[in-house]
């Protein structure tokens, strides 16, 4: 590990909950790392959404296709998809291999490699560098070459953890959808300024307060 790097340890596949919804909750407070020859970019994941089996908004809903095969890999693989012809979205496969489910990484609090991140998003305030799924991929240099990448490899683009205490997790409905909008499948870090979407949505529907992981 280079001097002064955060003590982020790679997540192993066995660390990941198999259930899609539990995986989306579990990933709040974990880290996305992109190691490059010029340095490391990393940040804490503060917002995710679950797209479980049977969800009609999931890209895997109609079964395996040439463009969505990464969603059917073992848990912890990247599924990178261009959305609306504008932005790439970074998803992670969930459930057992060949099931077809995943979670979307929606927002990150950038922590390491800020000059590298800011070079990809010039003139953008820190809060908005990776606040939203399209901004996230631009900020962290994630494109189609990472589709199918093993995020549990600890190399290149990977997910990790820093051992710390219990992390609070809020849950609300997903945003930006035209159907299946009312299920509580969006998870976030309460109080984080880096979470996307309207502030009024950041309340747990069941209790009016964030849950804990």
UniProtKB/Swiss-Prot annotation:
Write out the entry's keywords from A to Z. Answer: DNA damage, DNA repair, Hydrolase
Disulfide topology: none
Please name the CDD domains in this protein's record: AAG
Which Pfam family is one of those matched by this entry? Pur_DNA_glyco
Species in which this protein is naturally found? Paraburkholderia phytofirmans (strain DSM 17436 / LMG 22146 / PsJN)
InterPro entries, alphabetically? Formyl_transferase-like_C_sf, MPG, MPG_sf
Q: Which Gene Ontology molecular-function terms are recorded?
A: alkylbase DNA N-glycosylase activity; DNA binding
HAMAP family per the record?
Answer: 3MGH
* Top-tier EC class: hydrolase
> What family is reported?
Belongs to the DNA glycosylase MPG family.
GO annotation, biological process? base-excision repair
**The protein's name:** Putative 3-methyladenine DNA glycosylase
Q: What is its EC number?
A: 3.2.2.-
Is Ribonucleoprotein one of the keywords UniProt gives this record? no
């Amino acid at each position: 590990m280079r001097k002064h790097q955060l003590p982020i340890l790679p997540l192993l596949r066995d660390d990941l909950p198999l259930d899609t919804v539990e995986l989306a909750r579990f990933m709040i407070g974990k880290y996305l790392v992109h190691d490059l020859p010029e340095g490391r970019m990393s940040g804490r994941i503060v917002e995710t959404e679950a797209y479980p089996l049977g969800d009609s908004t999931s890209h895997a809903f109609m079964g395996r296709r040439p463009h969505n095969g990464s969603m059917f890999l073992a848990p912890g693989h990247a599924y990178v998809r261009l959305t609306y012809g504008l932005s790439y979205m970074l998803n992670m496969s969930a459930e057992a291999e060949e099931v077809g489910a995943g979670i979307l990484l929606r927002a990150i609090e950038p922590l390491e490699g800020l000059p590298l991140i800011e070079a990809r998003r010039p003139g953008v305030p820190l809060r908005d560098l990776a606040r939203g799924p399209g901004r996230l991929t631009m900020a962290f240099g994630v494109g189609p070459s990472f589709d199918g990448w093993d995020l549990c490899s600890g190399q290149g683009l990977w997910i990790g953890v820093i051992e710390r205490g219990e992390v609070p997790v809020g849950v609300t409905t997903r945003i930006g959808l035209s159907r299946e909008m009312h299920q509580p499948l969006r998870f976030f870090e309460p109080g984080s300024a880096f979470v996307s979407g309207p502030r009024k949505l950041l309340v747990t529907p069941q209790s009016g307060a964030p849950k804990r992981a």
